A protein has these predicted regions:
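Short, surface-exposed ligand- or partner-binding patches at beta-edge/loop junctions that are enriched
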Residues: 99
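Rhodanese-like catalytic fold shared by cysteine-dependent sulfurtransferases
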Residues: 2-8, 12-51, 66-95, 104-142
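Short hydrophobic beta-strand that contains or immediately precedes a catalytic carboxylate
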Residues: 45, 55-60
Length: 142
């Protein structure tokens, strides 16, 4: 019977140690969930682009980019062999607006950026399709 109080004490300490790990794991999960990109409609994107405080990244193919793109955009083709090196060359402390044709590829590229340490990333919902349908300006060629 002398061992019973010792057993209770060891059990209580073990439970306390496990409880601390759970709290730490929850904190890590919350931090990871907080790291995400923002979505914005084209009107908001135009405001951001015109402010001059954000860098516009177009992740479409060279053919799509040549057909029509937003003036000042930097093309980094998400399906191109130089996508990762193009992203690695960007300054992670800057703010980025990412666009594609319809919003799917730019969402993937935005998540890639977040996963690789970028913190200020905004995806344009609807992409160039929505941009052009709204009558916002574009340019052709490289």
């Amino acid at each position: 019977m002398k061992w019973f109080p010792s057993l209770l004490l060891m059990g209580a300490l073990s439970m306390g140690a496990c409880q601390g790990q759970t709290a730490e794991s929850s904190s890590t999960t919350t931090t990871e969930a907080a790291a995400s990109f923002q979505n914005i409609q084209v009107a908001g994107a135009q405001t951001m682009i015109n402010s001059g405080e954000h860098i516009l990244i177009d992740v479409r193919t060279p053919g799509e980019f040549t057909e029509a793109h937003i003036d000042g955009a930097t093309m980094i083709d998400i399906n191109g062999s130089d996508f990762e090196s193009g992203m690695a060359a960007l300054d992670k402390s800057k703010s980025y607006v990412v666009i594609c044709r319809s919003g799917g590829r730019s969402a993937r590229a935005s998540q890639y950026m977040i996963d690789h340490g970028f913190t200020k990333v905004t995806n344009v919902e609807g992409g160039m399709n929505a941009w052009l349908a709204s009558g916002y300006p574009s340019v052709a060629g490289q």
